[in-house]
Amino acid sequence: MKKQHLPIECAENGRKAGRQVLLKLLIMIVCAATVFGLFGGCGGSGENNPTDAPTPAQTIRPTAAVPTETPMPTRAPLVYSPDYHKTTPLMTKLVGEQAIKAARMVIDAFLKGETSVKFGFDSYEPTFAMNTVFAVNRMCPPFTAFALCNDYRDFDASTGVLKWKIINVEPNELDEKLQKFEAVAIDFMSVLREGDNETERALLLYSRLTAYAQYDYEAYENPQNLTEDEYIYRTSAYSVMCDGMGICYSFAEAMTFLCAQADIDCIEVNCINDSIAHQWNLIKLDGEYYYCDATWDVGGTFNYFGMTTDERVKDSGGIKAEDMRSLSVSPEELLDGVVPSDTRFAVLREHVTSMPVTVEIDRVNDRAVFTVGNESYSISCGN
């Protein structure tokens, strides 16, 4: 299967309702301007289009670093059930403790089939509703797919009440959709074992998502053929996890949810400018920060896992470090001046370039073993 880049699109708050509609329309206009001339299209246009660059050699070189000892499972299967209250430190830092507390209240009400919640806080910042809904959509993907909530229109600061309406499902069928998602989440997490470290967990979940899901070209290229509610569903993390179809912020939100469930610090990052509109993830592994782009690794590759800022910007079709944002916050501001620069995973872009790639964890030696056909390459997962 030949590697091809995917279309680029993004939405900062992800929902095509109220204020978000304008943002998504802007994104679609940017993407429409860039997609001309692309083969399956992502990025800018013309001679500098990264999709026009030669595809990396479809080879994977063996290395003596691959252990000769047969990996043996040494850890028990992970005991897991979905926890919609879990979030990440980066998310909490981005939106604030009050928004996280409010998000948990919204989630609890939604899971009961309710369509409003009264918060009862003493005061509300102007960005309170936006931050709360942003957090809810990442902590509870079913809310994104089956609830329509405009953070400004549907919040009344004078009463502290936030409202939403159920969409894409009959109210009496919501429980069935929740059960489906929870079963899928359990299946995703089944690749992990008790005691797996952060790097092992991240590699396994990333591989599970990129090898399973596909890019939804129809939703991206022909949104006019979908109703607003259908578009919300098709571009949700719920869709990419349950139906195996999504676009860039579907993949990015799914990674944020999965990482939160696996106790990995993670948040989405986007870039919107005249050349590109795209969304991916910022992830923290063993004390270092990296960028990961599951959308561009669809098919089960690792070309965009564990990138530095320089690697993220290089051959990206127009991504610029100064245009990167989580909500309205730059990654550098979010990380208190830290710029992702650790090159630990650069070897993957040198040695693991074919698709599909399978990854297994040698838990005896704490190594990740990447295999294509009969050839393998391994890296250390140790701290």
What do the predicted segments below correspond to?
Residues M1-T74, L205, D243, I247-S250, ...:
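Gram-positive cell-envelope targeting signals
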Residues C10, C31, C42, A102-A103, ...:
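Generic recognition of cysteine residues
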Residues T34-G37, G41-T199, L203, D315-N383:
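N-terminal accessory/pre-domain segments preceding catalytic cores
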Residues G96, G113, N197, D216, ...:
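Helix N-terminus capping/helix-initiation residues
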Residues I167, G195, M241-M245, Y249:
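Short, charged/polar micro-motifs that form catalytic or ligand-binding hotspots
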Residues L174-V240:
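Secondary-structure boundary elements
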Residues S236-Y238, M245, E288-A294:
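Short, well-ordered strand-loop elements centered on a beta-strand within folded domains, enriched
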Residues S250-D315, F370:
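Hydrophobic/aromatic-rich core segments of domains that either
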